[in-house]
Amino acid sequence: MKQYIVLACMCLAAAAMPASLQQSSSSSSSCTEEENKHHMGIDVIIKVTKQDQTPTNDKICQSVTEITESESDPDPEVESEDDSTSVEDVDPPTTYYSIIGGGLRMNFGFTKCPQIKSISESADGNTVNARLSSVSPGQGKDSPAITREEALAMIKDCEVSIDIRCSEEEKDSDIKTHPVLGSNISHKKVSYEDIIGSTIVDTKCVKNLEFSVRIGDMCKESSELEVKDGFKYVDGSASEGATDDTSLIDSTKLKACV
């Protein structure tokens, strides 16, 4: 079930984020030829329109932080019949990405999802766009193949959260010189899945928000293994599943942050 929180002011303290830094590995790979293996990827697209009175800030990709929380320690009070701790009491790790740029701090959380390997941003006036995605095989990034059963479980269990706050960061942009890499997931019409979890929006600086998530096979078109979810917050009203990710942003204007 989705949880939407709209902040009318910054009265609430920002949510604490875990503290262990996770570095992603990178190695070249290619699409597997095995029939029951799939390179699953994720594509997250977000468009934020800031409030009219918000100062224009075109400094994108000011900083990107990746943090993975450790798996929580099992409850010592809960034991199985053989006196060992039940694995069901261990929460899966969540990876957080904090992107500062364009006068915003965008915090994303990913649990049981495909790995994020590419992060990019663009800004035009009071509009800030961002994209977080996996990278399809053959582009110099590691992309492990998993079974069909594992892919279906990933589609069912993946959860993405977002927390957008105002930022007064003044440091310069740190745009990378390499091209923006992508997931190569098809953007055809597919069924909706409940992927987006909690969404927090600070209306002190955010006027409108459109947010799209798509998961699919990066090497083979398979409607069974491709789903999407969407969220809109426009003019004070929230709605689910209505975002058209094919025309949400102009991807050609994105610049690589990592």
Curated annotation (Swiss-Prot):
Its main location: secreted. It is found in: Secreted. Gene3D superfamilies: Major secreted virus protein (2.60.240.10). The keyword tRNA processing does not apply. Residues 68-91 have a biased composition (Acidic residues). Residues 1-17 form the signal peptide. Transmembrane segments: none annotated. One of its GO terms (cellular component) is extracellular region. Residues 65-93 are annotated as: Disordered. Induction: Expressed in the early phase of the viral replicative cycle. Binds to host CC chemokines, such as RANTES/CCL5, MIP-1alpha/CCL3, MCP-1/CCL2 and eotaxin. Belongs to the orthopoxvirus OPG001 family. This is Chemokine-binding protein. The gene is OPG001.
